[in-house]
Structures are given as C-alpha cells and as structure tokens.
Amino acid sequence: MDNYTYSELLKSLQNKCDNIALIIKPEKIKQELERIEKEQEDPNFWQDVLKARDTNKEKVRLNRLLETYQKTKNSLDESVELFELAQNDNDEVTLSLLYEEAPILENSVQKVEIEIMLSGENDASNAIITIQPGAGGTESQDWASILYRMYLRWAERRGFKSEILDYQDGEEAGIKGVAFIIKGENAYGYLKNENGVHRLVRISPFDANAKRHTSFASVQISPELDDDIDIEIDEKDVRYDYYRSSGAGGQHVNKTESAVRITHFPTGIVVQCQNDRSQHKNKASALKMLKSKLYELELEKQQSSAKNEEKSEIGWGHQIRSYVLAPYQQVKDARSNTAYSNVEAILDGDIDAILEGVLIAKA
C-alpha cells in the first residue's frame, strides 16, 4: 500500500461513516436513550412486563449501535489525523503501521454497516431452521446432516442456544430432515438469507469407486414470532396427524403418538414436531412453526410486490451456494459472488464472513 491508496481508502471510509450518520442519526439515538432511561425510572414501568422487556431490548440495541458507531468514527478520525502528521513529518514507521491496520479499520466500518442491516422488524428474533435433503438418498441425507452441524457449530461459536423441534434419521447415514430453533440476538437477521438450495460436490465416502458426486439440500429460515404477533389459521385449512416419536438419533422412542404433523392446505406447508414427550407441547411448537412460515411467506409476497417482481422460488431451482470439496476446495456464494477457500472451517461453523458478505451484497 502507498500514500495515495491509503488516502483514497480513508476518503471512502469517511464517506461511508457520513452516510451511516445520516441513517442512524446519533443525536436522535442519544435523545431516545435518555427518554427510555426516564421511562424506566417510573415506578409503574414493570407493570406491563412485555412492554418493559421490549423497551429493554431496544435500549440494548441502541446502546450497542451508538457505541459501535462512535468507536469506529473515533478510530477513523484518529487515523486521518495520524496520516496527515506522518505525511508532513515523512514518518515512514507510522505510515507503515497505518497501512498494516487498514484492514482492521475497514472491518470496523463494515461492522457498523451490518448493525444497521440487522435492524429489520424481525432481525432480532430467534431463527427457526428447516433442512431437507434433495434427491439422491444417502448422499443428500448425509449432506443435510453436515449442514445441520454447520449451523449448530455457528450457534455455539456465538454463544447461542439451539433446540430440536423435529429430527428424522436417514436410512444409512445422515438425516431425512430436521427442524430446530437457534436462540440468540439477531439469529434470524444473520441467517435469513440462508433460504435456498445448498449444493455439495465431493468424492463420495459411500461410493466404492470413489467417484465425484453432487448433492443438494434445501434450507428454510423463518423468525420465531413473539406471542403478541397474531397470525390467524382457519381450522378447516389444516390437518393434524399424530404419530409415534422416534426422537433425535433414534433415542427415547415413545409408545404413545406424541409427535405432531400439521399440513396447511392453502400453501402446502407441512410442519412437524416430536421434540417433547407431550403431544400438547409438540402441537403448540408445530403451530408456532407454521405461523412463522406463514408470516415469512406473507413478508416475501409484500417485498416482491413492492419491488414489482415475481416471488423468487425457494425450491430446487434456487441455488444460493456451492461447496466444492473435489477436485479443488472452495465455497462460493451466488448472491455476493464471493469465493472462500477455508472450506473445512466453514463446514465447522465459521460462516460469519459469508453471512455478512451476503447482507452487504443485498443492502
């Protein structure tokens, strides 16, 4: 890097920071935080528990956004000042240090951009994830289980919790399907763009001839809705099926029909839950899954209508990412058009760079 390149980078980052300030309005955030703090001083604040909880969540979000922005702006201002001084004094040591720290500065500004992108209506929600293998039997079922582990490892890395709703073992290996919740701040915001088909190319561990195979799995993401969001479901539009639960990994087989499957006729959506030994609890969880999927479907329709587009098909034609393990190693995302070589780390849950890249590409 030279002086001109670094100078242009600083101009670009300053421009981004100015645009961020226009969007988030730091002074208005400070005023809103003051208003919330006064509201919390009211003795009656905790009488409405749900409202108090939402207010606290908003306070945490605003504080984090303001702190992230302020820290980034201060670092940028300091770098601009140091750069000018180092140029005037012909201080090669300081210039070299600034060049080395340039990627950190870029990343800091990007983090603020991502904070803004995660301020949508449901972005702070938990995420309900459903993974279904495509055609191909054992190959695709094994691939679905690899994706399942990838998301679980991502959740662990972030300190998020996960809860299985439905799990069906594969015939020889892998899974026939899984539905689970990842619980953590902005879980849905980060994962919402994972909707679509994920493609794997590898030398099959199940093929004695060690041939290269291509497998597909579908991932669907929806927000876990708060109880205060009302989604009406007409009973005549659904069918309930009850069956015996096998449990994750084939353990704890129930002798009673506690597992629940719900089919929604107007949309064709099918959800099922066998997480609990109680049929009543499984039915409640399955209904929550159905409501979340219907809510997500309605949002997609509204967004497509607003953009005057046809709704993109989340099906076997909507491939969002390829994971190639042979003859070379690469993960490539179709939305950000970015390729990554750290395939092993990605499949072990190191997907933040991919998720953030897609958020920025779709901004």
From Swiss-Prot:
Sites bearing N5-methylglutamine, chain numbering: 251
InterPro entries: PCRF, Pep_chain_release_fac_I, Pep_chain_release_fac_I_sf, PrfB
GO cellular component, one term: cytoplasm
PTM entry text: Methylated by PrmC. Methylation increases the termination efficiency of RF2.
GO molecular function, a single term: translation release factor activity, codon specific
SUPFAM superfamilies in UniProt: Release factor
Subcellular compartments: Cytoplasm
Any Pfam family the entry gives: RF-1
PANTHER family named in the record: CLASS I PEPTIDE CHAIN RELEASE FACTOR, PEPTIDE CHAIN RELEASE FACTOR 2
The family this protein is said to belong to: Belongs to the prokaryotic/mitochondrial release factor family.
UniProt-recorded name of the protein: Peptide chain release factor 2
Naturally occurring in which organism (per UniProt): Helicobacter pylori (strain ATCC 700392 / 26695)
